[in-house]
Amino acid sequence: MVEWTDSERAIINDIFATLDYEEIGRKSLTRCLIVYPWTQRYFGAFGNLYNAATIMANPLIAAHGTKILHGLDRALKNMDDIKNTYAELSLLHSDKLHVDPDNFRLLADCLTVVIAAKMGAAFTVDTQVAWQKFLSVVVSALGRQYH
């Protein structure tokens, strides 16, 4: 079990309190699909992903990005039991969707870049430490079924 300080909890909650889920979700997922094009293979049913412009304009990608952010909201609300909170989602991604678990880390990195850009100077070292810890726990929980 991960131990969270009051400061870490406050930082994570503050980040989520200011997030525009639609904007940040869309930007994070599109960034991941563009920067790491091999991740596109999991989104074949989402239509044309031919180039960066079509990915950025794809409403299904935008909607899925929003869904991902709402999924992170579940982790926020269950910070003391993220592993069990994501057990079913981990099973889905491993057994049914066959997602390479390294892609969770890539998406987390893209999400960090987008949030840091949005927050600017407010994304301090302490903020990044707490945020990276949170995402590391989420990524580990999502990859649980692969171990």
Curated annotation (Swiss-Prot):
Domain Globin: 3-147
GO BP terms in the entry: hydrogen peroxide catabolic process
Free-text tissue specificity from the UniProt record: Red blood cells.
Keyword annotations from UniProtKB, A to Z: Heme, Iron, Metal-binding, Oxygen transport, Transport
Listed transmembrane segments: none
Annotated positions binding heme b: H64, H93
Gene Ontology molecular function: any one: oxygen carrier activity
Pfam family, one: Globin
CDD domains in the cross-refs: Hb-beta-like
Any one cellular-component term (Gene Ontology): blood microparticle
Gene3D superfamilies referenced in this protein's UniProt entry, alphabetically: Globins
Family under the similarity heading: Belongs to the globin family.
Note: Hb 3 displays a Bohr effect, which is enhanced by organophosphates, and a Root effect.
Assembly notes: Hb 3 is a heterotetramer of two alpha-2 and two beta-2 chains.
Function: Involved in oxygen transport from gills to the various peripheral tissues.
Name of this chain's protein: Hemoglobin subunit beta-2
Organism: Arctogadus glacialis
